[in-house]
Amino acid sequence: MDEVSLDAWVRDIETVVDAVGLDRFPLLGMSQGCAISVAFAVRHPERVSHLILYGGFARGAYRRAKNELELQKAKALATLIRTGWGDDSPAFRQLFSSLFMPGGTKEQLEKFAERQRKTTTAECAFRYYETTRNIDVSDLLPRVTAPTLVMHVRDDQVTPFDAGRELAAGIPGARFVALQGQNHIPLEQDPVTERILEEIKIFLEK
């Protein structure tokens, strides 16, 4: 992994959509993918017909920390990732997975943790985490021209609800939908997932 940056991730989207021949399309961003999607939509306004953002933020955890305690909490997870990512201890995997999907079944939590561990090294995961926590696309939000739907669960343990509200407030004309739930990653058995899909369907049909 040579470059880990917002610009590199935007170029990744460019590469994929060019390869499949998409000229204009709806773009869905989740978690840190929301900031990346915002950056893409601003760089290529003619290509994004609709922007859909779930569980995201404009400012990463390091940038939006209101005090030293909040900053240290965010950095504590970075330390855990760097030191415990490849560890066989179930304690780290349980902590990490339960943050993202507290309503997950035992099987879902274990599969998620194992997938994370196998798909990248501890050092790459750390660099990825540090980069996303330093993202700030606040200045890009007013430049988004695509119709935008922003959704966020109220009890998200990874990205605070207020971060989602801030994201929506900065985008002209964005619709913000507050959802009852706690899973940062939508789960099949979670009732809120059906609501998310319905909101997207209605939004795209307008």
Please provide the spans of the model-predicted regions.
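Flexible "cap/lid" loop of the alpha/beta hydrolase fold
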Residues: 38, 42-43, 48-83
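Conserved alpha/beta-hydrolase catalytic His-Asp/Glu region
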Residues: 86-131, 140
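Short beta-strand/loop motif that positions the catalytic acidic residue
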Residues: 144, 150-152
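Acidic catalytic loop of the alpha/beta-hydrolase fold
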Residues: 155-159
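Catalytic active-site module of serine/aspartate enzymes centered on a nucleophile-bearing elbow/loop
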Residues: 174-206
